C-alpha cells in the first residue's frame, strides 16, 4: 500500500515543475526520508488550532528521536485539499431549453484552499502543486455542496514539500498568518 501511495504521489508531482524533485526523493534507492502529513479537520474546527497541532507534532517527533525511533525525516510532504469553482450542472439543465437570452457564468479557474495555512506553507516550501484526483467524484457532486451560490466546487489534491530544517520556521509563519497561540 505504501508503494502504491508513493507511486501515486510521484506521478502527480511530475505535472509540477516546482515538485520535480519529489519522485527522486520518494524513489526506493533514495536516502531521503520523507514524512507524510495528512491535513484534514472538521469544517467547524477553527484554524487557530493548526499551529499548536503542528507544534505538538514537532515535539512528538523530537521525543521519538530521543527514544531512538526512526523519525529522522529530511523532508515533509503535506497533503491537503483545494478546489476550483465549476458551473452548476443543475443550472445548465434549467437553461438548456432557452437557446437565446441569459448565458451561464463561466467558472473562474482560480484555485481556493480548504485550509488557509496552506498559503503560509508555500513561502517555506521547496515546491507545491495542485493535482486532479485519479478517481473523480460523481459529476453532480459539486452541486450537492452548493448553498446559495451560483457555482459548485470541484475538489482536488494539494501537496507541499518542505525541508525538515525549515519546518519550525514554517510553523511560526503559520502561527503569524493565522493568529492564535503558537
Feature names for model-found ranges:
Residues 1-182:
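Intrinsically disordered, low-complexity, positively biased terminal segments
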Amino acid at each position: 500500500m505504501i508503494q502504491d501511495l508513493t507511486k501515486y504521489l510521484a506521478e502527480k508531482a511530475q505535472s509540477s515543475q516546482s515538485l520535480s524533485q519529489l519522485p527522486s526523493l520518494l524513489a526506493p534507492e533514495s536516502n531521503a526520508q520523507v514524512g507524510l502529513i495528512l491535513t484534514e479537520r472538521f469544517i467547524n474546527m477553527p484554524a487557530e488550532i493548526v499551529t499548536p497541532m503542528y507544534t505538538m507534532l514537532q515535539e512528538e517527533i523530537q521525543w521519538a528521536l530521543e527514544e531512538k525511533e526512526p523519525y529522522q525525516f529530511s523532508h515533509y510532504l503535506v497533503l491537503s485539499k483545494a478546489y476550483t469553482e465549476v458551473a452548476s450542472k443543475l443550472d445548465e439543465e434549467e437553461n438548456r431549453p432557452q437557446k437565446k437570452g441569459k448565458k451561464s457564468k463561466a467558472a473562474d479557474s482560480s484555485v481556493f484552499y480548504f485550509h488557509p495555512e496552506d498559503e503560509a506553507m508555500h513561502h517555506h516550501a521547496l515546491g507545491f502543486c495542485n493535482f486532479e484526483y485519479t478517481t473523480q467524484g460523481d459529476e453532480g457532486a459539486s452541486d450537492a455542496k452548493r448553498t446559495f451560490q451560483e457555482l459548485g466546487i470541484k475538489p482536488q489534491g494539494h501537496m507541499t514539500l518542505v525541508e525538515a530544517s525549515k519546518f519550525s520556521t514554517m510553523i511560526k509563519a503559520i502561527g503569524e498568518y493565522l493568529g492564535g497561540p503558537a
